[in-house]
Design a protein with these regions (language model features):
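Secretory targeting signals
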Residues: 1-7, 62-138, 159-240, 279-289
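Residues that define the loop-to-transmembrane-helix transition and helix capping
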Residues: 155, 244-245
Length: 289
């Protein structure tokens, strides 16, 4: 029952969502005028006194309370309008757009940190499991004739096993990412894929001012390529250790351990490990440390 009662934050968010989704897109004079008129309306409400209005002090307080959530939501939207106008005027082009940010914050990895790290950890476990087994099994089963054949034969075997592990990792990556993306798409209106990524205040420091779609694509490519690096590194470790169990344990400690440490509340490890590439939003925002 408690979950069905909207909180202050929920109501404020709904008003912010209303203002942004109603006006999102390229900035126009009409949109600027609309927001200025709303700002004036709220200023009048919160500057009311019994002397300058036909309301009593009690009625004024009641009216201000009734508009509290709408005013808070509008203020958040208006600050975004000012941000966009300032950036566009500074560049002399109407490039940045009004965008309802919340859904994109989840897609970029700016929110729900622990949930995101769990998803990445599942992908890392899949990468390590597949990579430690494909060659490790050869050693465990003493299939040494395959590994001691010729240099060309060893290379072909390694590449074949590497391809298998890449494929398994890619499939798991898709199975983890697609439901997460669909969940966000189902909960938030994402209608500005072509807008510049710096249109959003939380992504205003992006080192590449590409489209939002391009930014999301870059994040996914960074994650997948990093997972492939983990696969390759794990297989190389397997060649050295010649034991699938030891390879899996050490690889999980090397690549999964930092994710668990960051999940546990030590954010600095993000910048000192592959976490920064597996979760590349901070790097793309120019945050190296």
């Amino acid at each position: 029952v408690g979950n069905s009662i909207p909180t202050y934050r929920d109501i404020k968010e709904e008003y912010y969502k209303f203002y942004m989704t109603d006006q999102q897109g390229k900035m126009t004079e009409e949109k600027v005028e609309y927001f200025n008129e709303e700002r004036k309306r709220f200023e009048e409400i919160y500057s009311m006194t019994p002397e300058n209005s036909d309301l009593t002090a009690v009625e004024i307080v009641q009216k201000q309370e009734e508009n509290k959530y709408a005013h808070e939501g509008f203020s958040e939207a208006y600050s975004q309008v000012m941000y966009i106008m300032s950036n566009n005027q500074g560049k002399g082009v109407n490039e940045q757009e009004l965008v309802y940010e919340k859904g994109y914050q989840l897609l970029f990895g700016d929110k729900a940190v622990k949930e995101r790290l769990i998803g990445i950890l599942l992908c890392v476990i899949a990468a390590v499991y597949s990579a430690s087994g494909v060659l490790g099994t050869e050693y465990d089963l003493k299939v040494m004739n395959l590994l001691r054949s010729t240099k060309r034969g060893r290379k072909e075997l390694f590449l074949k096993k590497l391809g298998v592990s890449f494929g398994i990792t890619a499939v798991i990556f898709v199975l983890v990412k697609i439901p997460a993306i669909l969940k966000v798409v189902g909960e938030y209106p994402l209608e500005c894929w072509g807008a510049k990524v710096r249109s959003m205040m939380f992504a205003g420091q992006s080192v590449i001012n590409c489209s939002i779609f391009g930014y999301v694509l870059m994040l996914m490519i960074m994650q997948l390529v990093t997972l492939f690096v983990i696969v390759f590194s794990t297989m190389a470790l397997s060649v050295v250790l010649k034991d699938s169990t030891m390879t899996m344990i050490l690889s999980l400690l090397l690549f999964g351990g930092p994710l668990l440490i960051e999940w546990g509340g030590v954010p600095i490890v993000h910048y000192l490990s592959l976490n920064s590439l597996l979760d590349g939003h901070q790097i793309l925002q120019g945050n190296w440390l």
